[in-house]
């Protein structure tokens, strides 16, 4: 178990028995710490103990690239109905945000990452998320193992060769299973749609993910003009 220690806008991940050293003082997380406890440093400042949830892990995971945004994860779960007990095959682990979220809702996940260093980071992130026993991070190319992979409820892809895997979706998925392809470019989405058609998948849709925060002040209310609301494109299809 890893806890989030919170003081104002400061947050730190620590496990029981580990020490936290900041300018606010030093403290050691007790072995019997529980969410809601207040821990005091030797200088008298307090930190509140929280159990990390998905958004906290997104903020604190070590990153190996641009991770999937929580809004994209939400769409994956919403469009596919991913749930506890599902078997998920994921390719393009990266930081492991999607794999961790799916593991935390109770799915059993097998995720492939080609880069050995990225895979090692993802395994540590799974440990921080508490899903190291249900998320199997494998180093390698999923296309090399497709002949031995079957019986999955959900196939999620964030790789350049995703269309190649989409064509094999009928061999990988159970009847009624879903495949989701995340692509940063429209061309990748088009290729995924064409591959889904070639594989006789149904209910094929593509969605651009855009989110805008709202700004409220004395002058009025409007969408925040800072930042970029667009993240990418999600193509969803189903095997009958």
Regions found by a protein language model. Name each.
Residues 108-113:
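Conserved SAM-binding motif I beta-strand of class I
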């Amino acid at each position: 178990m890893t806890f989030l220690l919170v003081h104002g806008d400061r947050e730190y991940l620590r496990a029981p028995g580990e020490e936290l050293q900041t300018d606010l003082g030093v403290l050691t997380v007790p072995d019997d710490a529980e969410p809601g406890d207040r821990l005091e440093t030797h200088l008298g400042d307090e930190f509140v103990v929280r159990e990390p949830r998905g958004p906290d892990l997104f903020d604190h995971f070590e990153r190996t690239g641009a991770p999937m945004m929580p809004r994209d994860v939400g769409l994956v779960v919403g469009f596919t109905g991913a749930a506890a007990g599902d078997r998920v095959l994921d390719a393009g682990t990266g930081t492991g945000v999607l794999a961790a979220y799916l593991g935390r809702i109770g799915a059993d996940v097998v995720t492939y990452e080609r880069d050995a260093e990225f895979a090692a980071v993802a395994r540590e992130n799974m440990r921080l998320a508490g899903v190291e026993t249900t998320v199997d991070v494998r180093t390698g190319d999923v296309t090399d193992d497709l002949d031995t992979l079957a019986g999955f409820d959900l196939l999620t892809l964030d790789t350049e060769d995703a269309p190649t895997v989409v064509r094999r979706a009928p061999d990988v998925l159970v009847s009624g299973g879903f495949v989701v392809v995340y692509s940063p470019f429209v061309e990748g989405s088009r290729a995924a749609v064409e591959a889904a058609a070639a594989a006789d998948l149904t209910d094929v849709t593509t969605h651009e993910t855009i989110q805008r925060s709202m700004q409220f002040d004395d002058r009025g209310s409007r969408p925040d003009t800072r930042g970029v609301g667009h993240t990418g494109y999600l193509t969803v299809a189903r095997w009958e």
